[in-house]
Regions:
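Phosphopantetheine-dependent thiolation modules in NRPS/PKS and related acyl-activating systems
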Residues: 1-44, 48-85
Length: 85
């Protein structure tokens, strides 16, 4: 399963009742009901699913506001290319 598919699955588990499969990758997730509590739950699920640690300064909808943002963050952490904030 690719990163985006896994993120969409995790959104389904943590982001509330919404059709996450059909949300465009660049759409603001807040528009679709994502809130800060869902965001923290999602980040915890991502850390467990991908075996990564999201830096505290990257927690929040500013950095994981779209599916594309989330996938990019995961890739950067996995590749060791996450730039300091």
């Amino acid at each position: 399963m690719n990163i985006e598919a896994q993120v969409r699955r995790l959104l389904g588990e943590t982001g509330g009742p919404y059709d996450w499969e059909n949300v465009p990758a660049d759409e603001d997730l807040r528009r679709d009901g994502m809130n800060s509590l869902n965001c923290i739950s999602l980040v915890v699920a991502i850390e467990e699913a991908f075996g990564i640690e999201v830096p505290p300064e990257r927690l929040g909808l500013r950095y994981v506001g779209t599916i594309g943002d989330i996938c990019g963050l995961i890739r950067n952490i996995q590749q060791g290319t996450l730039r300091p904030e």
